[in-house]
Amino acid sequence: MAILNILEFPDSRLRTLAKPVAMVDDGIRQLVDDMFETMYEAPGIGLAATQVNVHKRVVVMDLSEDRSAPMVFINPEIEKLTDEMDQYQEGCLSVPGFYENVDRPQKVRVKALDRDGKPYELVAEGLLAICIQHECDHLNGKLFVDYLSNLKRDRIKKKLEKQHKLNA
């Protein structure tokens, strides 16, 4: 396993549209393992392949405190099940140090393939629904900051650009 480099906003590669996985093979399973290791090390609760500069439709998540509930979503498709919205303060490994309120549908259904390429379906509410939507947004080149006002997004962008220059 390996720790992968996480791209940070405003890196343009985060805007790349991820391509579907044609076949779940050992290479995809290795990517999944590396993504989990990277996510846990960061630490975070979700990671999309786009964030590690692999533009395939792969997401890993684990909402548990003790790394006991790893979830894999390959080629996920989301269906909104309600018009009711929840507001959560979201953060992102690609937007480090920033947390903002985002409104998202309260309940969704996701269809995906698991680590072995087997199809499954899951109805999600609460934090799980929020995380699934957040991570799947990455696969479509979208970040949680895109839900914010231009003013807030530009402020975050400038602060991160300044931080990147200091770290260079």
Curated annotation (Swiss-Prot):
Question: Pfam families this protein is in?
Answer: Pep_deformylase
Cofactor detail note: Binds 1 Fe(2+) ion.
Binding positions (Fe cation): 92, 134, 138
Reaction catalysed?
N-terminal N-formyl-L-methionyl-[peptide] + H2O = N-terminal L-methionyl-[peptide] + formate
> For this protein, what is any one GO molecular function term?
metal ion binding
- Identify the catalytic residues: 135
- SUPFAM superfamilies given in the database record: Peptide deformylase
Q: What is its EC number?
A: 3.5.1.88
Q: Does the keyword Protein transport apply?
A: no
Family annotation (InterPro entries): Peptide_deformylase, Peptide_deformylase_sf
- Note whether Hydrolase occurs among the keywords: yes
What domain of life does the native source organism fall in? Bacteria
Supply the alphabetized keyword list: Hydrolase, Iron, Metal-binding, Protein biosynthesis
Cofactor dependence is on: Fe(2+)
Q: Name one GO biological process term.
A: co-translational protein modification
Role summary: Removes the formyl group from the N-terminal Met of newly synthesized proteins. Requires at least a dipeptide for an efficient rate of reaction. N-terminal L-methionine is a prerequisite for activity but the enzyme has broad specificity at other positions.
Q: What is the similarity comment for this entry?
A: Belongs to the polypeptide deformylase family.
Enumerate the NCBIfam families for this protein. Answer: pept_deformyl, PRK00150.1-3
Please give the name of this protein: Peptide deformylase 1
Gene assigned in the entry: def1
